[in-house]
């Protein structure tokens, strides 16, 4: 059924609509995921294939497809929605590649040439190489850096600043030939610009420009199985919105799509899927994980959840392209008939479906409810009370995975990982929307021959050695830049530090202009 449905999408999309998706693969760590600029992620819908593979090159997938849902009301209570469950381009998508522009600009060659492929892939190593060589005679700026969409075209009605970049001379212009470079997170990132206004607008869209940065780290711990998402929604409309809702829809397929369960953990802002039995068989052309199948989750690092849970019954009916009212109700914890979700154990209304831990029999889960496993879809939603014109809602997510034990042990470990990531995120205080957070890159950072951290990853006790560095102090900062430790190191070339009391996560050790990343496991 899964394959037949997606093939139907592919046929319809290819047959009717000119605007199609452009794809990139993010595969720097143990995850290989497909991304596009038409409102979908982790999917290859036009080929009818799942798009989130872990382990990489194994053929095993945990997510079939994902998409963005956005809704809000104006001052009179009128609803505006941009949402589609399966985005395959054209009418099958709520978002389309490129930034908001003047209405007359979308059909021009200038817009098509600039944003026909509104998706860009870049690595930290490419940036470091560019920093070291941009002043060298004969150096050619690589395409990944030269094509970075730092500035918009004013003559097309596009905002002057688009994707974040480091502006060395502070003139507001992205000039890679003069040393400017993309401002990314992670070891590798894919940046996507989309809007809900350019393709056959019906008056019900919000006028939102969506900027998504997916990024990964290659490490020796759980981050090697994690993909991060920084999402910026920019209100380019002439309206002030109220009761803003933003959701991620996910069609989970843990190998075999027909034997899964879904749950959520509001305290850790987490939605997750796990196998409904102990063996994940291959079925329907999809490879199963076999014994001890994994748990796959997604958590919101930046916002508490408004609602989360499995889509069931009429909430999950069909694959229609317009289901604005149903999507809005779901994002507000309601059924398609406007009734509120109910927790059967407490007989009270709830915003969170199956919010119990399946390892605990007295909590509300699909296990304790004796639900038959099956094909599972879910969503998690965040909210903002007010979304003014020209303002930005910035949110951060992490897609986490574990297969270290049996199917229910893996659920607990995903919950543990989510808690560790959330603690690490929150320990950094406020997180600026445009901050790279995890890596402030300069041409003198991350030089292993001059500053060495061992062991790395570490359980807490680390040994530092350095040479040819003139500095009086050693500093340790969180991934958000907050200073948490400082030590005088004058006339020293080595020291031992115990950071075992800190939350698990990523930290940066800096001596002078030299920096090393350390992972506390």
What are these regions (language model features)?
Residues 1-23, 438-441, 508, 515:
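Bacterial Sec-dependent N-terminal signal peptides
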Residues 5-8, 231, 390, 519:
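Intrinsic structural disorder/low-complexity segments
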Residues 2, 13-17, 41-43, 470, ...:
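Intrinsic low-complexity/disordered segments
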Residues 4-7, 270, 277, 441, ...:
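Residue-level detector of intrinsically disordered/flexible regions characterized by low predicted structural confidence
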Residues 174, 441, 472:
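Short clusters of hydrophobic/aromatic residues that line enzyme substrate/ligand-binding pockets
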Residues 430-446:
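Low-complexity, Pro/Thr/Ser/Gly/Ala-rich linker/spacer regions in secreted
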Residues 6, 444-521:
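C-terminal outer-membrane/trafficking sorting elements
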Residues 19-434:
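A long-range scaffold signal marking pre-active-site subdomains of enzyme folds
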